[in-house]
Amino acid sequence: MKKLLTSLMLSTASFMLLLTVSNKAYAYEETETFTFEIYNMNSVVANPGLYNYLVDLTDGYGYGQMQHVTVDISLLDYNTAYLEKNLNGFNLFFTSDTGVYEFGIDASGNIELLNDPVAHDEYSLTFTGLNNAYQDLFYEEIVVEFEIVSFDSLEGVGTLDPNPYVVLSELLTENYEYNETIAPFIWVNDVQYQNYYSVYDIGSDLALIEIDGPTLNIYSDRFEEYNETFDVGDEFRIIFKIYKTWTQAHDYGRIRTNASTLYLNQQSDTSALLSHSESTNVINVNNIAVGDEIVMQSPYTDFSVSYGNVGFPRTYLVEQENIAAVKMIKNSSDNTNYTFILFYWENGSVVSRTVNNINLANRNSLNIKFDGGFRKALNYSDVMVANVDLLTPLEDFLPNMVAWDAIDGDISDSIVITDNDGYSPDTVGIYNVEFSVTNSNGQTSSIIAPVHVVDIVNPVINGVSDTVHISYDQTFNVTNWVNSLTVSDNYYTGLSISIKENTYTVNKNKLGTYKITVQAVDPSGNIGTLTRTIVVNDGIGPVFNGINTITASINENITVEQIKAGLAAIDAIDGNVTTSIVVDSDNLTGKANTVGVYEVVFRAVDAAGNQTFHTVTVSIVASPPGFYILNSNSVRLLPGANLTIEQILNILNASDAENISTNYTVSVPGTYNLSFTLYGESHQVSITVLGQNDSIIPTPVIPGESNPGFNITYALIIGLSAIALLATTVTILNKKRK
C-alpha cells in the first residue's frame, strides 16, 4: 500500500447531539487515538482497549452504521469514513477515489485490514464520539428478524415467519413519522450484507430482497459478490437506524434500555416503557435484570424520577433543575442496589454526578415524569416584543430563533418568515408570525410565535404644577386646576385625566403639606402622572379682645400699661397669644394730664408670624375725677367717686337723655344698669362702682379661661351701636336738659 500521509491526522469533525436546553446544544464527546502497525499481510494487534472503548463509545446499543462517531486514520487519503458495529465487533470503512479500505476490529482488540494490506505500515486511528455514559436518544435502531420457512428457488420466492411486511412497509413509507432513515443493513445467518437499497417493499433494480406481504423475493445475482445462497431455515436480521427531529420526535422524553424485558413503544401487563407522547412512564423494577441499564433523556431542562408503592408516599430520587438525562443501572437482583448517573447543566456545560447504593427494595415501580410539554425543533427563546416607536422589522427577531436538526445540526441561519400575519411595526397588537426552517433533506418544520408590538411610553400631562401656598381660611379649587391640564401621548389620542390621589380636600382647613396627583392611562396600560403640592399655612393674624376707647379725667394720669392690661389676643391656630402684645406706637405717654385725644397702637403676632394691630383711642377730659368710660358703654367709678346719675349722663355726653331708668346706688360697689333714650335712640350702659381691690380696667375674658373679676362687662357693646361716642373721642358736654 502506498503511503499517502506520514503525519498523524486528528479529526476535526464532531457529532452534535440533537438535544437543546435553553437554546444551547451540546456534544458531550471525547476523542482518543489508537496506533497500530501491520506486521504481516493479513492481521495486526491493536491497542487492547480499542474494542472496549468503541463499545463504551456506542454505549452497547444496536447495530449498524454509527453515525454519531467520526473516525480519522493516518496514511490514507480518503473522502469519507464511518464505523459500523456488527455481531462480532466493528468494521471501519474509508472511501477514496481509488476504492474502499475496510478494517475489522474484533472483541479481542485485533485489527484486520481486509483489503490491500502493506506490511509495516504504521497507522493511527482517531475516534471522536459520545462519552460512554451519555448517549443521544433522538435516534432509534429498529431490528426486524424473520426466518425463511419455504423456498422455491435460489433466485426466487420464499415465505416468512413471522410476517414483517407491516413493519417494513411502514418504515419505508415517506409519510412515516421518522425524519431520516439510514439505509438498512441485512444479516443472513449472522453474516452482514450492505446495499443502499438492501430492502424494499416495491420493485427496485437495486434491492437485495423485496418483502411483499408474507412473500420474500430474493435477488441472488445481487448477492454474487458475497457468494451467498439461501434455503429454508435461513435467519434474516434487518436493522434500521432512524433519526428524528424534534418535530417528529417523541413529545416529552425518550427512554433507551438494553433490558430484554422492556420494549420501546410497547406496554405489557407487568411493565411499561413509553417513549412517545406520554408525560409519565412507570417501570416495574422487578422485571429488570441485574446489569440492565435504562437511560432517560428529555429535551427540556427538568424532569423527575420517583419510586413508590400503592399506599406509600411518593419519594423523589431525582428532582433537580436543569437535568438533561438520567442513567439507571441495576446492580442487585433484590433491588437493594441501583446506580443513578445524573447529567445536568452547569455553567453552560453538561456535567455528571453519580449516586450509588440507591435502595429500591419493597418498591414495585419507578415513576418517570417528564415536565414541560412538547417542544418543536424550531423554537424561540424569549417573548418577542417590538417597541412601536422603533419600527422594528420582523427580521430582527430571527436571532431569537433556534433550529436543530438530527443530521444537519444547527440550522438556525436557515430560518425564514413564511407568514407575517399582517405585521405592522407601527401598529400596536399581537401578530402570530410563522417561522419555518428546512433541512438538507427538504423537510420543513414551522412554528407560530406571537410577536408583540407594544407601546411602552407613558402619557405626558402638561400644566401648572408648582407648589401652592394657601391659608387655612382659603380653598384651592382642585376642579379648575384639573380642567386646566392637557395630556399628550406618543401613540394614542383622546386620553382623559383623572385624580389618582388627593389628600388636600379633606384637610384643607388643617395646616400641613398635601398632594394632589392626577393620572392619564393609555390603552396599553402606560400611566402618566402629575403631582401638585398644596401647603396649607396660617395666614390669619390674632384677634384682639378688649377696649377700643377710653375716656378718663386729667386727674387719673392713665398709663399705657393700664390700657394693655385690658387687652387680649386670640389666634385661631395658636390660641391665647396675649403675651405677644407689644406697643407699636404711643402718643399718650407724658400727656395723660393734658386734655386731648390720643392713640396707642398695640401689635400681636402668632407662631406663623402673622401680625395684627389694634388701636385704642384715649380721651383725656377736664371732668370730676374718679371715672373711666370704656368703649362708650361702660362707666367705671373709682372708690370715693360719688357721681350722681346726672354727672354720669354728662360725662357720657347724654345730658339730654330721656326715659332714664337705673338701679344705680351711689358709693355702693357693684354693677348697675342704666338705660335711656337719646334723640330717639335707646341706649344701655353698664355702671360699675369699684371696690378697693378691683381692677381699674378689667382683664378681657379668654375663651376657655375663667376670669371672675371681669363679668364680661365689655361685651355689653351689643345694642349701643348708635351712640355718638362710639367712633369719636369722648368730650364732656355741659348742655342742659331741656
From Swiss-Prot:
The chain crosses the membrane at residues 612-632, 712-732. The keyword Signal applies. Coiled coil: none annotated. Keywords: Membrane, Signal, Transmembrane, Transmembrane helix. It is a multi-pass membrane protein. Its main location: membrane. Residues 1-27 form the signal peptide. Disulfide bonds: none annotated. One of its GO terms (cellular component) is membrane. It is found in: Membrane. This is Uncharacterized 81.3 kDa protein. It comes from Acholeplasma phage L2. The lineage of its organism: Viruses, Viruses incertae sedis, Plasmaviridae, Plasmavirus.
